[in-house]
Amino acid sequence: MESYDVIANQPVVIDNGSGVIKAGFAGDQIPKYCFPNYVGRPKHVRVMAGALEGDIFIGPKAEEHRGLLSIRYPMEHGIVKDWNDMERIWQYVYSKDQLQTFSEEHPVLLTEAPLNPRKNRERAAEVFFETFNVPALFISMQAVLSLYATGRTTGVVLDSGDGVTHAVPIYEGFAMPHSIMRIDIAGRDVSRFLRLYLRKEGYDFHSSSEFEIVKAIKERACYLSINPQKDETLETEKAQYYLPDGSTIEIGPSRFRAPELLFRPDLIGEESEGIHEVLVFAIQKSDMDLRRTLFSNIVLSGGSTLFKGFGDRLLSEVKKLAPKDVKIRISAPQERLYSTWIGGSILASLDTFKKMWVSKKEYEEDGARSIHRKTF
């Protein structure tokens, strides 16, 4: 009887992004906790008693003492590269600093980027069932949840975060696996590209903690130009950015050159599609009868769609590729930074969620295979 009681508890929703992890309980409006998905380790020698305790820092503490630490992201392009660090971060999510709960008492909804290696999902299931002893687990695709958050059942979600950009067409609640498009170019690549431009302008950010400053500059100062060729010829007004040490830097054309990468991956020698092509090709791979509806129901999601001017630029690029008389409507929800988590919170609080998850018993009987049966 006891295991049934546990399964009736409120599920925990973890949106496991490459850059930021968002966690909270199903039924909440917004995630309770959001923190960078990295682990910090001190890079200097302790010489004083009473020095900062601990060898590993995660969450707000890692952010606060960033300059002292060497920072590593366990995830790159939506795929976990370092499982030990990933496990530590998940452990921290349940700790007294965060959700203050025991993992064995709550079912879990975990998000994942589409077209991820099966191995990644199997290993995640293994960690949650065997290390954290969760009573039930469901691994859901990020884009589907973003659509839940908008209250629609039809649309094409363009989700661009820190590690992965993908477009998923969904019709009346059915996702079309054959139409999904994904490229591994997203926010972190823009940050790296911006760091390169800043280096050319004489500002050197080389350590892992200084990379976080570049990320902050990107979020504050960068924008997407509707006509980059024209902006190159104009004198761009420089933006001033205050660094943590009190000095300022002036950023010129790199403000729009760096995010341009999302539309033109060839700028860093990548042969993949631009973000606008990812969207249009996903629609074109869908059934002909559905395309018109999908073009008029484009939903943006993820932090890399928050650049100033992103929507206008996307619209102008999609217009060039779409059939002439098709109506294009792009919806950019205000809370799109969290829309995957919000969708997860909605889904996990529905009664039907119980039919979707894999219980610990099923996992023990069938092993990692069981996790693929319930996800596509």
Swiss-Prot record:
Matching Gene3D superfamilies: 3.30.420.40, Actin, Chain A, domain 4
Protein name from the UniProt record: Alpha-centractin
Similarity section: Belongs to the actin family. ARP1 subfamily.
Molecular functions (GO terms): ATP binding
Organism: Homo sapiens (Human)
The entry's keywords: Acetylation, ATP-binding, Cytoplasm, Cytoskeleton, Nucleotide-binding
Compartment(s): Cytoplasm, Cytoskeleton; Cytoplasm, Cytoskeleton, Microtubule organizing center, Centrosome; Cytoplasm, Cell cortex
Assembly, per entry: Part of the ACTR1A/ACTB filament around which the dynactin complex is built. The filament contains 8 copies of ACTR1A and 1 ACTB. Interacts with dynein and adapters such as BICD2. Interacts with BCCIP (isoform 2/alpha).
Reported function: Part of the ACTR1A/ACTB filament around which the dynactin complex is built. The dynactin multiprotein complex activates the molecular motor dynein for ultra-processive transport along microtubules.
Biological processes per GO annotation: vesicle-mediated transport
Modified residue annotations for N-acetylmethionine: 1
Chain ranges passing through the membrane: none
Encoding gene per record: ACTR1A
